[in-house]
A protein has these predicted regions:
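A short, Lys/Arg-rich alpha-helix, primarily the initiator
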Residues: 1-24, 28
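Short coil turns linking two alpha-helices in DNA-binding domains
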Residues: 21, 32-35, 52, 66, ...
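Short C-terminal boundary/hinge segments that cap the last helix of small helical domains
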Residues: 61-80
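Active-site-facing substrate-recognition patch
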Residues: 82-153
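PRPP-dependent phosphoribosyltransferase catalytic core
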Residues: 84-98, 231-308
């Protein structure tokens, strides 16, 4: 049995997920726009006032929401419309978690060697984060909130984790958004429409259109590798317009160029700039290290040439 507060909370979360205010959802459902106002939730004598069965039925119908989906909103973390300050706080929260779990490392004196063979004073391993439950849960709640606010739950049919590091994040976020998940391989396995995809992706969504799929990955440097996943999803019949990463380097111009060429809007929890801000505010590293890292972030090629 659910409480009065839980039912109203679920209605509020459903409204946000569908892109409405409570009054907007009431109006969309053919009800008086004040039906879901907070003042209407308590009777004049102070007793709880529940939404009527008829009004709830209209809401579920107009939003194409099943009762089981509605109930799932009760157990979810609050999904709220985010402003820039909210997003900045999320970015710093994620940056701090990555530093605290040593998923981000700074080393100016003995730079890391990247896959390209070039040197870098910073290193990021988002896969490490999955082993830290509290930090992971905080970031995944924020990720679900960000995606819901920026894109809208009703505009996403399926979440697709990219092999391999994107798979756990796809699972965590899809669970919070109560959405199906698939994962996409780097290379095909077998033949046919779903040769590069594991899981079930129907040919059409409830509206009869191609399913709207968002790609989930752990990080993005220049975005070049995303093309493999996005093209595989599109070849399988998906509409892909958005990608989400926990961490975006945000220092390579090619990142935006590659996303624009693919017609993708990138969403990210945090970047190197947020990590640098948090490291400086909390005195995680000495001044020399921070200045060298900042020089790298502003001009990676120049820094690498000097380090060679």
């Amino acid at each position: 049995m659910f409480t009065h507060e839980q039912i109203w909370t679920a209605l509020d979360r459903l409204a946000i997920a569908k892109g409405y205010s409570p009054s907007g959802l009431a109006k969309k459902s053919g009800l008086d726009s004040t039906s879901f106002n907070k003042s209407k939730r308590i009777s004049p004598d102070g007793k709880p006032r529940w939404p009527s069965t008829e009004s709830l039925s209209k809401v579920l119908t107009v939003t194409d929401t099943t009762m089981s989906d509605f109930i799932s909103f009760i157990d979810q973390e609050p999904l709220t419309a985010l402003n820039e300050n909210d997003k900045n706080n999320m970015a710093k929260r994620a940056a701090n978690a990555l530093i605290e779990t040593q998923s981000v490392l700074f080393n100016v004196k003995e730079p890391f060697t990247l896959k390209s063979g070039k040197k870098s004073p910073v290193y990021i391993d988002c896969r490490r984060l999955i082993s830290f439950v509290q930090e992971r849960n905080t970031l995944m709640n924020d990720a679900a909130n960000l995606i819901s606010s920026d894109i809208g739950r009703d505009k996403i049919d399926i979440l697709a984790g990219g092999e391999t590091a994107g798979i756990p994040y796809g699972a965590y976020i899809s669970d919070r958004l109560n959405k199906p998940m698939i994962y996409v391989r780097k290379e095909p396995k077998g033949y046919g429409r779903m040769a590069q995809i594991e899981g079930h992706m129907p040919e059409t969504n409830k509206s009869g259109n191609k399913p709207n799929v968002i790609l989930i990955e752990d990080l993005q440097t220049d975005g070049g590798s995303k093309k493999i996943f996005i093209e595989a999803l599109r070849d399988a019949g998906a509409t892909v317009e958005h990608a989400f990463v926990v961490f975006h380097y945000d220092i390579f111009p090619a990142s935006k160029e590659n996303m624009d060429a693919l017609g993708i809007k990138l969403h990210a929890l945090t970047t190197w700039w947020s990590v640098l801000d948090v490291a400086r505010e909390n005195h995680y590293f000495d001044t020399e290290t921070l200045e060298s890292v900042e020089a790298f972030l502003k001009d990676p090629i120049k820094w690498q040439d000097q380090a060679a």
